[in-house]
Amino acid sequence: MATIIHHGVHGHLYQSQKMNKALCEVLSTLLIVQPYESYRQFHVYEHHGRAFSTFEDKDLAAIYQLGFTPGKSKTELYAHLFLTLISPKFHLVFFYGRLKSNLVGVPPYRLVMTLIWWAALAGMSILLGTSATILILLLPFVVFYQMTSLLHLLTEHVWIVRGEGESVRESHINNSLARFCGEICPKSFAPKYIGHWAKWLAMHLLVHLPCRMLIVQGSLVCHDWHHRYGTVRQWYDYAKLREIHAHKLSIEERYDYHDIWGVHNALDYVFSSLSRQERSELQTARLTYRLN
């Protein structure tokens, strides 16, 4: 659903911008996330524009605000990630931002949609009871959604501020990652490789499949191509279009994509990149950020 909203704000779903907006408003109301207009302003005009890889990029600001700052060791970053994912404060602040974005500064029709949906959720909670509400609504809607949202955000880009002399387009290319789910097969089906096949199967069932379903859904696996050609409407064909372009660059010996297999490897790549930077003295509390 988040992938559909993402392409909706880019205007890729329907020819009619009103239809794109209507669908995004309905889906974002159901998910309790940022409304169409504010998300479009931030994502299309800032994150995909000149603000990318600067302190004006609210995604980068969110990463730094959460404590994933340059100069920290990989051990520090991994420990901080674990503590953040289980932190009540992180989840409460995140969820508060989601609630606020649906109430403050929204058009009257959106406020009505929000209140009706929240009333429906309250009614369902009463009918379901406490235990079922926690299992069916609170855990998926709040905790799991926010965990996977953070993991997606951390791994979609290398969160490094644009370097001196680096153009906006170069920063989009240099700091965007492809996150493919899977790994190479063992060499053969010979009995001696049975352990390798068992590991391969376990990784696909327990790591790559959940990551594909929960963290990098839809076209998010090739989000790097999207940052190069964000106006292309064929979002359902992004993987094929990226492969065509990658093949062309390879033939021309200009290949500059960052292909990473396994979301866990993408996370390690990002943390490695951050750890190699100089420790930042930036006062992150001053950054304007968003979590949604």
Regions found by a protein language model. Give the residues of each.
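Generic hydrophobic alpha-helical membrane-span motif
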Residues: H12, G163, V232-R233
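Non-catalytic, topology-defining segments of multipass membrane proteins
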Residues: I4, K18-K21, T29-L139, L220-D224, ...
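Transmembrane alpha-helical segments that form the membrane-embedded catalytic/substrate-channel core
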Residues: M1-G8, E37, I86-V93, L138-K192
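Protein kinase-like catalytic domain
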Residues: H12, H47-H48, T155
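Juxtamembrane helix-capping/reentrant segments at transmembrane boundaries
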Residues: L13-L31, D59-F68, S167-A202
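Membrane-embedded alpha-helical segments that form the functional core of polytopic membrane enzymes
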Residues: M1-T3, V26-E37, V142, L206-Q217
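Short, motif-level signal for alpha-helix interfacial/capping segments enriched in acidic residues
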Residues: I134-L137, W197-V207
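Short amphipathic alpha-helical segments
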Residues: Q146, L214-W225
